[in-house]
Amino acid sequence: DATDKVVSILKFCKDPKFRKDIFELLGVTYQSKNFKAFIEPLLLHDYLELTVPDKPTSPKQQYRTTKKGLLFLETI
């Protein structure tokens, strides 16, 4: 279910993680459709943030749970 995936991602990204590691956690392929389905909405709602915000496509880019994301985890 979608909520379970969101919770899994936010817990997993308490420490910064690469996109490929997030996809591996979810058991999905490394494709832009999966980025748009799973990571992009969390970025747009400020639950995840970029570790290299000025270079979104950097090969060193990782994703980290924000304070807002951590607060969300506390409510469930």
Question: How does the language model describe each region?
Answer:
Residues 1-76:
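C-terminal regulatory or interaction extensions
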